Amino acid sequence: MSTTLLRTIQLNQFSLLGTSLLRRRRSNNFSVRSCGSQTTTTHEAKQSSPTRVAPKNHKSNQLDEILRDYEAVIGIETHVQLSTLTKAFCSCSNNYGSYPNTSICPVCMGLPGALPVLNSKVVEFGVRLGLALNCDLSLKSKFDRKQYFYPDLPKGYQISQFDIPIASGGYVDVDIPLEFGGGHRRFGITRVHMEEDAGKLLHSDTGDYSQVDLNRAGVPLLEIVSEPDMRSGIEAAEYACEMQRIARYLGVSNGNMQEGSLRCDVNISIRPIGQAEFGTKVEIKNLNAFSAISRAIDFEISRQALLYNQGKADQIVTETRLWEEGAQKTVTMRKKEGLADYRYFPEPDLPEVILTQEYVDSIRASLPELPEAKRRRYEAMGLGMQDVLFLANDVSVAEYFDAVIGKGAEVKLAANWIMSDIAAYLKNEKLSINDIKLTPQELAELIAAIKDGTISGKIGKEILFELLAKGGTVKGMIKAKDLVQITDPAEIEKMVIQVVSENPKQLEQYRSGKTKLQGYFAGQVMKMSKGKANPGLLNKILLEKLNAKD
């Protein structure tokens, strides 16, 4: 029957599978969430009177008192979808957003007789990520079959790694932003293993039917399993952010959560302060943003702590819960499966993965500077932590900044220009730094022109926005528009005398105590000079004339 079902999908590219397995009662329906240009699915299970521990964005004083008695223990499973050209075990293209069921073949559809062939790029990316996370690599690893049934899993099993992952025993260092208390954290990495993704179910708004898209089936993933080292929603969210940064720095994934390229499942339990034994672990899914990770964890901590405090700890069960963004709460999805339910056994159609030390060393030598090393380097340059976190957050911004200072620009000035005016321009125009016309060389030239007094800061900003939009050279624009700053004291003094003599009323008011009128006079001189008068020299001469005794 399954063969017939899957052949139907191949013939009809977006076939509706009208089987009872894909139908859902209204009490156990599937909701559809729009995420960017893609429709993704979330499961909403039957839930009777879910507990709402705290109103949105508010915790009562009573709950705060309860929370002081408990400690959260949090771990995260992060699925990183790899940016390979083809899928993990077949030659189908790995293109996000393709028309449904157009990137499929007998291998990723699980048809009889079709055999998988490992994409070597998946192994390379696994080694790169394992090294970046300070893991020990397995020079000999293998694939296993993780068996379970779900309509988007055509083979009836997932090719994964069970007891011998490609990497294990690592750690990652994370800097917590200053607004959340700051500080440095180190979180352990249990393992990194290779596996394939499942397909995707798209459900009707009514829940009466579901559609299957197998384009994603067989797309390569790396799953990163952390140690249960996190203790708050903020720590967990920052850990997930760091996973995204590392994946992007390495070039193994675009890490776009809205496309499903980075997916996080959170495991959380709480225990009374001082207790060594872990509490009952609950998994949370449907976390589509880093802020959602933090909010979902904070809610779940509150929910479990309240149950503990009420003597209802037995109601905290091992289960999978969903985060409902609209309601700002978690709800039960299903009872959590154990390892035995998956009936792992070695994948018979794939050989062992054998790595040589020479291969590992060559990949290690090709690793770029990673976010943690970049942050420490920027810190050593004298930048504040806020600047460090901003610049190192995006690999493209970091590369641009490095290129600017590589052209001789002063570190702090370059950071200020990128973080203020350029960042504002990018936000307003909805662009990335790779889209702008201003090259690092020209930004360095602009900073130098302001610093050496060739142009004023005000003129510099005007030039900046034109260069961002249209490109060009700083020297060429200064020459073409006659923007060279006036630094001749005699010329500035002449303009000051003229402005003061033309405004006797304002001069009298200034000398009567309204000293704020200095700005008025300075503005008039700037207007006369078309913004080219040196501000420092102008203010010095202006004060002399305004305070002179006639």
UniProtKB/Swiss-Prot annotation:
Taxonomy, superkingdom: Eukaryota
GO BP term (any one): oxoacid metabolic process
The entry's keywords: ATP-binding, Chloroplast, Ligase, Mitochondrion, Nucleotide-binding, Plastid, Protein biosynthesis
Known EC number: 6.3.5.-
Compositionally biased tracts (Polar residues): 35-51
UniProt keyword Cell division, yes or no: no
Subcellular location: Mitochondrion; Plastid, Chloroplast
Enzyme class, UniProt record, top EC level: ligase
Subunit record text: Subunit of the heterotrimeric GatCAB amidotransferase (AdT) complex, composed of A, B and C subunits.
Note, other: This protein may be expected to contain an N-terminal transit peptide but none has been predicted.
Name the UniProt record assigns to this protein: Glutamyl-tRNA(Gln) amidotransferase subunit B, chloroplastic/mitochondrial
